[in-house]
Amino acid sequence: CEKEGIEDPRKQQLRYIKQIEQLRAEVQGSFLEGYYDEIIRRLELGEIVKSPDMEDVDFFRCLNAVVNLKKSLWMRVFSAAVLNDSKRFKKDYEKKVVKVLVRSPLYEEGMTDDEILSVHGILSYAQVMEWKGPLLYKLKGGQEYIEDKAREKEYEIDTSQNQYGTVINSQTLERAFPVSIKGVQRIVTIENKANYEEMKYREDTLYLFCHGFYSPKERIFLKRLMEVAEGEIQYFHWGDMDMGGIRIFRFNKKNIFPKLKPYKMDREAFQEALERGAGIPLEEKKKEKLEKLNAGELEELK
């Protein structure tokens, strides 16, 4: 019989199973289904699950909210929306949520917590998109009236006139839609800011600054470039020749440009960089990780 105030263990397990099944139903088709399936199996085997804390409803609320996010949000805005407290997510749940997000197909080994959250749409730093090249995009904003009916205004902005580059912030990025990259034969993402700045404007090339792992907003914008491209386009990535550069190349190829090829990231370029005095000795642990890393087309850099 149940003692007063103490829940019967069997009933508690059944309650937990039902709770997790409901959470799983909210994230159908996502990697979290597998995470919740594991918890259910543990509960069905009679395990007393302590990690995660089954009574911490807010943790599960945060987890599902991240996966179901429709647009990028600042971390404090997300925290206020989900927990009614702008600082609580960072204080109580950031580390716990990140620990689960490493299961996501968007995860690349070595990502920082900020990068993991950013690729899922939780932002902790200013987000801008930078490029050089003949990109025409449509921007929605404001209202106009046609026959007394209000509709959202649309503007077409031709950035081919910005010979030294174009920069748009996160609000603009959210409302911008690429319309044309007429004449472009190559799209090149460049990880190093100095290298990006040195590139001269070319009518046949679109240079994109790659600050790291692209966020959801940026990935949507970049994928649309492929939809409006005319003819056969070549895709290249010029990144740092280290573990981070390899991971960013893999991420961009897997999640944005399937035909992406490395640019100036071969053995010859690596040797030239060493001769110029670039590079630092690798710690033994990092060296071991690099040797185990599946570098794909960049295998020779290992």
Each predicted region: which residue ranges?
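Pol beta-like nucleotidyltransferase catalytic core
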Residues: 234-236
